[in-house]
Regions:
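Short, low-complexity Pro/Thr/Gly
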Residues: 1-210
């Protein structure tokens, strides 16, 4: 048939694009999506937030996936020179955040990068732009009481942390607080857990992840 002739002439790599179209100008299609639920959960941590202190936050398998993590405390998203924020222009070194999986460090950020590079540049939506905290300014919709840790798994739904596939590995975030940091109150750490249906959970447990 003409379709087979076209397939042979174009190549097998084009099967995915032309073989099973999902959109037609002449009929209506309904796309099916998998079911999931989300719930923010408070996370326990080991250590005390304060100047030069180290804090470990174990990521428990309360859900199937983890999308993003943030810290709540009065004035924790400080700008310029301050005492209550994880960043200060007067600090000798910034606060460091590192992600550890199975005893190996897989990602590391610091508050200078977060507020000096990430927040000013990666504002791809109006909502993010109105909440941004940089080294010198805090936008109008940011109260300064929340500090998002922008690890890779919180930026894109396709890169969420598959906790269900890491059940035999210790997963934790380690924080090395900057010098001069004096929290106003006891910080609280939260994580956004995602819960999958049975079929999709099986996909995450049975397949390799890169």
């Amino acid at each position: 048939s003409a379709a087979l002739i076209e397939l042979v002439s174009v190549g097998a790599q084009d099967v995915y694009i032309t073989g099973d179209p999902q959109v037609s100008f002449f009929r209506q299609n309904y796309k099916r999506h998998t079911n999931f639920a989300m719930k923010p959960e408070r996370m326990d941590y080991i250590g005390t937030f304060g100047a030069n202190n180290e804090v470990a936050i174990p990521i428990r398998s309360k859900g199937d996936l983890m999308s993003y993590i943030w810290i709540e405390s009065t004035g924790i998203a400080g700008v310029q020179e301050n005492a209550t924020g994880l960043f200060s222009n007067a600090a000798a070194s910034p606060t460091e955040f590192s992600l550890w999986i199975g005893g190996q460090k897989v990602s590391q950020l610091d508050s200078l990068f977060i507020q000096g590079v990430h927040n000013p540049l990666l504002r791809d939506t109006t909502a993010k732009a109105s909440m941004a905290t940089t080294t010198n300014t805090r936008k109008e919709n940011n109260t300064g009481n929340h500090y998002m840790i922008p690890f890779f798994f919180g930026e894109d739904w396709t890169k969420v942390l598959p906790l269900v596939a890491l059940q035999y590995h210790d997963v934790e975030i380690r924080i090395k607080c900057r010098d001069g940091y004096i929290p106003t109150d006891t910080p609280k750490v939260y994580g956004n857990y995602i819960y999958l249906d049975t079929e999709e959970r099986k996909f995450f447990t049975d397949n390799d992840h890169e």
